[in-house]
Structures are given as C-alpha cells and as structure tokens.
C-alpha cells in the first residue's frame, strides 16, 4: 500500500493514535476488538515476530526511508482488507496529534492478541523448558545461554498486582526476562502492559 500523506489531523483514521483513551483501545467489553500501540522500529520488529496483527502505521517524513524494511514486514503481516495504511504526517503535527515527540519515528496500531488460558500458558512454559533441556542435552545449545535451567520441573512465574505505572510494568517485564522468569501474569488491577 502506498504511503498516505496527511496534512489534516482531523482524519478519523488517526483516532487510534491520538483520540482514543487507553480504556477505549483496550476494549474490555469486546477484547477481540481491542487495539494497542507499538512505538519504535525495534519494538515493532519484536511484536511482528510475536505474531501481532498490524492495523495501521503512523510516521513522520524523516522516517520513511529508514523504515521501509519494517513497513514491508508489517504490510506482509497485515490481514486487513486493502492492506496496511501507512500515514505520514509532519513532525510538528505528529507531536500535536500524539501529545509527545515521536522520537522513535514510527507507531504501529495492532489488534490485541488473544490471551491464552492458564492451562495453555503453563503447557507452553513446560514445552519451552523441555525443548531447551533437550537442546542442551543434544549439545545444540550452550547451558549458559539457556537461563532458567536449574530445575526444569519448576516454573518461575511473576504475578503483578496493582502496578499502576506503565514505566514500572515495563521495567518489571524487562527484569523478568533478564532473570529467566517463565511467565508474567498481570491482574486486572494493573495498568495495561501493552
């Protein structure tokens, strides 16, 4: 899909990036219609690797050439009729639209992934631990690179309750990954991790 240059911020297609509240994006009543916003090429890359469903993209002109590869990947992952709309707005307008400088150049609106059941999550954790253990046993993986291998029969799960600051939730997720935590559960009293 070609890039769509916009001069007016009144375009309703930009609502998802600026005029919808977190609660409206999250859409608790109809979670399958929920949306979350991903910022930066690096985070978009990780989200696409995780299988998210892209809906639309917003960037400023100076990022168009630098992000062609990630835009192509997002377009390839988009299942929306008509493809992935990629909106380009002047930097000052992007700042006015979002309320902050789009310092990482690119925003991607994505469909919220369906959360696994507790049983499915634990089965996935167990399968990943077993696969890592088998790879170490076969000499395909260095034990030092595996992380939480000290006891494959135990699961290490972090539970976040009542964390209301997005920065803290992000820091906890990064720390959990660094410590080899197998899964992170977030209660409804936490702010949205996405």
What is each of the regions a protein language model found here?
Residues 1-68:
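Boundary-proximal intrinsically disordered activation/regulatory segments immediately upstream
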Residues 4, 42, 49, 76, ...:
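RNA substrate-binding interface of SAM-dependent RNA methyltransferases
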Residues 10, 65, 92-97, 116:
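A short acidic, often aromatic-flanked loop/helix-cap motif at beta-alpha or helix-coil junctions
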Residues 75-101, 106:
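Glycine/small-residue-rich loop that forms an oxyanion/phosphate-binding "nest" at active or ligand-binding sites
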Residues 66-70, 191-194:
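Short, glycine/polar-rich helix-capping loops at beta-to-alpha or helix-loop-helix junctions
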Residues 37, 58-63, 107-109, 111, 157-159, 162, ...:
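Structural motif
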Residues 105-115:
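Short, structured interface segments
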């Amino acid at each position: 899909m070609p890039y769509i240059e916009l001069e007016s911020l009144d375009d309703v297609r930009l609502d998802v990036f600026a005029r919808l509240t977190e609660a409206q994006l999250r859409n608790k009543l109809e979670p399958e219609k929920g949306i979350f916003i991903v910022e930066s090429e690096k985070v978009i890359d990780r989200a696409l690797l995780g299988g998210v469903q892209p809906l639309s993209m917003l960037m400023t002109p100076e990022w168009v050439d630098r992000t062609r590869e990630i835009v192509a990947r997002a377009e390839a992952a988009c299942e929306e009729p008509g493809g992935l709309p990629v909106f380009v707005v002047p930097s000052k307008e992007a700042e006015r639209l979002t309320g902050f400088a789009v310092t990482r150049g690119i925003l991607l609106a994505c469909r919220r992934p369906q959360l696994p059941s507790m049983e499915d999550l634990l089965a996935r954790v167990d399968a990943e631990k077993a696969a890592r253990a088998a790879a170490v046993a076969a000499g395909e993986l260095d034990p030092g690179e595996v992380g939480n291998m000290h006891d494959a029969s135990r699961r290490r799960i972090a539970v976040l309750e009542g964390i209301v600051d997005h920065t803290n939730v992000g820091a906890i997720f990064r720390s959990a990954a660094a410590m080899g935590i197998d899964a992170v559960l977030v209660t409804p009293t936490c702010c949205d991790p996405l």
